[in-house]
């Protein structure tokens, strides 16, 4: 329909294989359901690749496979391996949230703090003293939620940190739009309270993703150097000899 590869101009086709995300959320990465999904996906991709190479010839197509995030193993699976892991009880969380908000209201009045999911926002009308009181109460109470590692302000996250975790936390903060208070979970813990799993933490299991460049007459090689997902676009631009803005986050890397 789109006549891909029919002329001298390169064509770029994006495919979102999103079922893998849903299956992983519901059943975990090591589940039989995910295994079945991967086996079927592998076959579908193989059929697709073969059909395209039959039309255009081998070596004329470059395939790039990656992911937008990793995932946490099921906490139950990790616990069986002797790893401290768990789910945040929604009932316990909501109870502590309720107690905390009542304490804050008793100190500074109503309509000053807003909660969205597990994040807390301060009303712009709050003065410095009110912010200090609210922050102290939030830190004192929310740390009692089992599985919470720390309760921090966005300004604390923006402080320089040399380790990967601090850098990742800092990168997720927008000074004007981000929550004022963050709850950082312990490693291997999740807000998913009943079943399945999730992602979104700064830990390696959530941030480490696969990246495969295949085809295009490239030599097979496994690399262990540090590459970021934002490096994919400028790398592809370099391969296609396309100009790209130099002030973007990503940097091209060599494919040998």
Which residues does each PLM region occupy?
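Surface-exposed acidic, glycine-flexible loop patches that form ligand/cofactor-binding
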Residues: 1-8, 53-57, 171-174, 202, ...
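Soluble non-cytosolic domains of exported or imported proteins
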Residues: 7, 32-39, 43, 128-133, ...
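Secreted, luminal/periplasmic, and some membrane-associated catalytic domains
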Residues: 32, 43-189
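Short, His- and charge-rich active-site/binding loops that engage polyanionic ligands
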Residues: 181, 189-191, 196-200
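Active-site His/acidic residue clusters
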Residues: 2-41, 47, 78-79
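Structural motif
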Residues: 12-16, 64, 182, 212
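Extracytoplasmic/secreted cell-surface and envelope-processing proteins
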Residues: 23-26, 72-76, 130, 191-194, ...
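Substrate-binding rim/cap in mid-to-C-terminal beta-strand-loop elements of soluble/periplasmic
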Residues: 15, 91-132, 198-240, 254-256
